[in-house]
Amino acid sequence: MTEVRLNNQTLVRLEAPTPSWKWIKLSRTLKLKMLNLPGVKIFRGAPENEDQDRDNLM
């Protein structure tokens, strides 16, 4: 199971495994910083862009 977070808020929990390269591509495409931990993917954006970042990930 993988938990996806944006600025410390859980967005979704995925049951199926997802390759790491897809997470890296997503973070580069959306220009977000990513912390890649086993079972947790944490994305960080600039505080002033939190709402826009959340919409982009959903």
From Swiss-Prot:
<protein>
    <recommendedName>
        <fullName>Probable U-exon protein</fullName>
    </recommendedName>
</protein>
